[in-house]
Amino acid sequence: MAERGYSFSLTTFSPSGKLVQIEYALAAVAGGAPSVGIKAANGVVLATEKKQKSILYDERSVHKVEPITKHIGLVYSGMGPDYRVLVHRARKLAQQYYLVYQEPIPTAQLVQRVASVMQEYTQSGGVRPFGVSLLICGWNEGRPYLFQSDPSGAYFAWKATAMGKNYVNGKTFLEKRYNEDLELEDAIHTAILTLKESFEGQMTEDNIEVGICNEAGFRRLTPTEVRDYLAAIA
């Protein structure tokens, strides 16, 4: 009850030391569609569930796995409109870096800058925190990277992680399956199997999205490729 009086104030700490609006933003993430990221020896895979709103909905009109640069991509769990704002901001930050330094932005630099934007929205008046967590993958300096950034602006590097609905089950599954020598092909299968742990209904190429990042860059798998991977694990 003591927290309730602070729940509408973004910039005021509650007596227990919480910013309650951030707690609510994290709840929005935990209720969002599951997403998985796995760093392999030779690349990174991102996978997510794409909920179909209606049989009349064109499921390929909006993507959840998005490229930021040729070598960086991301996915989210949480609120789609907030995600699109951050995708636009991330692309702009990457372009600004390139204009100044004449080289692609390193993955860790982009993560730091996007997380700073998210953190700014936890201490400014007239705004609210972003209701999304991001998984950001990239390839630079000859190696893969995987980061997670939360509504608070906190970010961490991961070997493999899951977020969104039933993320605890996803992380438990990954802890059992992950090893340091995992190849990208195996990581794709593992990512899809992790999603399957909490998937409701039939998994098809229309209701999941997969992105991969390796030495060749970042790309979203085509529906045909996803269908082939689903057939391989069936």
Swiss-Prot record:
Phosphorylated on tyrosine residues; which may be important for nuclear import. The modification Phosphoserine is found at S7, S14, S16. GO terms for biological process: proteasome-mediated ubiquitin-dependent protein catabolic process; response to virus. It is found in: Cytoplasm; Nucleus. SUPFAM superfamilies: N-terminal nucleophile aminohydrolases (Ntn hydrolases). The modification N-acetylalanine is found at A2. It comes from the Eukaryota. The keyword rRNA-binding does not apply. Its main location: cytoplasm. GO terms for cellular component: cytoplasm; nucleus; P-body; proteasome complex; proteasome core complex; proteasome core complex, alpha-subunit complex. The keyword Signal does not apply. Keywords: Acetylation, Cytoplasm, Nucleus, Phosphoprotein, Proteasome. Ubiquitous. The modification N6-acetyllysine is found at K70, K171. The modification Phosphotyrosine is found at Y6, Y24, Y76, Y121. InterPro entries: Ntn_hydrolases_N (IPR029055), Proteasome_alpha (IPR050115), Proteasome_alpha-type (IPR023332), Proteasome_asu_N (IPR000426), Proteasome_sua/b (IPR001353). The 26S proteasome consists of a 20S proteasome core and two 19S regulatory subunits. The 20S proteasome core is a barrel-shaped complex made of 28 subunits that are arranged in four stacked rings. The two outer rings are each formed by seven alpha subunits, and the two inner rings are formed by seven beta subunits. The proteolytic activity is exerted by three beta-subunits PSMB5, PSMB6 and PSMB7. Component of the 20S core proteasome complex involved in the proteolytic degradation of most intracellular proteins. This complex plays numerous essential roles within the cell by associating with different regulatory particles. Associated with two 19S regulatory particles, forms the 26S proteasome and thus participates in the ATP-dependent degradation of ubiquitinated proteins. Belongs to the peptidase T1A family. This is Proteasome subunit alpha type-2. It comes from Rattus norvegicus (Rat). The lineage of its organism: Eukaryota, Metazoa, Chordata, Craniata, Vertebrata.
